[in-house]
Amino acid sequence: MSGIKRTASSNRWMLEHFDDHYVKLAQKMGLRSRAAFKLEEIQQKDQLIRPGMTVVDLGAAPGGWSQVAVKLAGDRGKVIACDILPMDPIVGVDFLQGDFREDKVLQALLTRVGDAKVDVVLSDMAPNMSGSDSVDQPRAMYLVELALDMCHQVLAPNGCFAVKVFQGEGFDEYMKAVKAVFKVVKTRKPDSSRARSREVYLVATGYKL
């Protein structure tokens, strides 16, 4: 390991992470990640999840969003989560580990959803970042396209969709695609999202197809 040097950007990320107010608060509150606060802020503004709803959480690990979703959906609700990474169990969450880009994983996820329609699709998916926009942005846009396709397959009429998108090439076209199938689409930048990050969240309500 002595021959491996950390880059300035990775060192900066480590310093930011461990000095981050939301990281410390998440640890104090027993939340799995600081990302939980992003969904909580979106929920406060847009009221996406209500008791009894069925929610699909894509890119769920380590479980911050699933923790929030299962609390909001309550005992009568259902949360189905998926991630390529492992996730420790959460009471009330049906977790599938697998690569959402693979058809066999999609089919397994659809099997868990069953015949009932889903009320909310959440996606906090992001690719492993290489540091090259020309590589990272297409990968990120591919994931959000898959998340929108999931909406087309499982979302109930008037259902909701919240998805992390990185601003850059393909963003405007994706926004148009989301607006074409939802009645209202808002762009959110939660306070808990790092200011220098290009990530925003599209919050779409009133699914039309």
Curated annotation (Swiss-Prot):
- Reaction catalysed? uridine(2552) in 23S rRNA + S-adenosyl-L-methionine = 2'-O-methyluridine(2552) in 23S rRNA + S-adenosyl-L-homocysteine + H(+)
Task of the protein: Specifically methylates the uridine in position 2552 of 23S rRNA at the 2'-O position of the ribose in the fully assembled 50S ribosomal subunit.
Please name the HAMAP family in this protein's record: RNA_methyltr_E
The entry's active site is 164 (proton acceptor)
> Does the record's keyword annotation contain S-adenosyl-L-methionine?
yes
Annotated InterPro entries: RNA_methyltr_RlmE, RNA_MeTrfase_FtsJ_dom, rRNA-MeTfrase_E, SAM-dependent_MTases_sf
Superkingdom of the organism of origin: Bacteria
Key words of the record: Cytoplasm, Methyltransferase, rRNA processing, S-adenosyl-L-methionine, Transferase
Protein name in the entry: Ribosomal RNA large subunit methyltransferase E
NCBIfam families given in the database record: PRK11188.1
Enumerate the GO terms in the molecular function aspect.
rRNA (uridine-2'-O-)-methyltransferase activity
